Amino acid sequence: MSRACELTGKSVQYGNNVSHANNRTRCRFLPNLCNVTLISETLGQSYRLRISANALRSVEHRGGLDAFLVKSDDKELSQRARLLKRQIAKKQAEAAA
């Protein structure tokens, strides 16, 4: 299981802790990942995802998992999230027709 958000692609960053004397020590900055269950209204199912707390706020701000995935860019999404996005788009196209 990688330390990356499945929806936004946010992952581990590397940098320095800098002391008052300007001594630098390497460190890793880990994303705040949460295991959450999100419900797709279009598909009528719940999906368990490992996403960052920031992504969870974005999902709620955009109005749910379906709206977030439709508006998001494919290159940021994980392979599983891309599959979910395609299923949602297909189901919405069927409902519109």
Swiss-Prot record:
A Pfam family assignment: Ribosomal_L28
Protein origin, superkingdom: Bacteria
Listed A to Z, the keywords are: Ribonucleoprotein, Ribosomal protein
- MF (Gene Ontology): structural constituent of ribosome
Q: Which GO terms describe its cellular component?
A: cytosolic large ribosomal subunit
Q: Which InterPro entries match?
A: Ribosomal_bL28 (IPR026569), Ribosomal_bL28/bL31-like_sf (IPR034704), Ribosomal_bL28_bact-type (IPR001383), Ribosomal_bL28_sf (IPR037147)
One Gene Ontology term from the biological process aspect of the record: translation
Keyword Ribosomal protein found: yes
Question: Does the entry feature the keyword Ribonucleoprotein, yes or no?
Answer: yes
Q: Which NCBIfam families does this one have?
A: L28 (TIGR00009)
Which protein family is named in the record? Belongs to the bacterial ribosomal protein bL28 family.
Task: State the PANTHER family in the record.
Answer: 39S RIBOSOMAL PROTEIN L28, MITOCHONDRIAL, LARGE RIBOSOMAL SUBUNIT PROTEIN BL28M
The molecule here is called Large ribosomal subunit protein bL28
- Native species of this protein? Brucella ovis (strain ATCC 25840 / 63/290 / NCTC 10512)
Its lineage reads: Bacteria, Pseudomonadati, Pseudomonadota, Alphaproteobacteria, Hyphomicrobiales
Tell me the gene name.
rpmB
